[in-house]
């Protein structure tokens, strides 16, 4: 079934892959592209010349964050940087894309792309958990990263993102960390679980 999709691009070196995703999406769907100013630095001039890439309020009349939030069936942030995820989780609206996200009340897909150390940082993980009630996180994968590194943080491939959009997966709940069972008002049985295994399971399920 054809969809109206708003593709959001942020300032990651992996943003060049968004051009391939746009090509896949545009074959049978209506697609509009919003980008942050940083995102523009990582997509080709050819792509920008062939497509309308909206990044500034000055490019559109009226209230585009309202109009496009109501127009789109889905918003896909591909790729999403640590900075963008953190701003979104904290309700910041300092650009057109973030303002539109905060207006949107349907399914949002976010594909993180960053170094493993950033992705596993407690603050980033907390932001992802906070957003997970309303956002479907897609990836990242383990693989090649910037400056020749390898790790968990590689953006999922365009075809994977496309398949997720059109072959929706079921939701699951993963619990982790220490548990407590009260014996009476004073005594309790607990454990020293770190929650690392549960987090690893959750990350694998998100990918």
Task: Give residue spans per PLM region.
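A cross-family phosphate/adenosyl-ligand binding-site feature
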Residues: 1-207
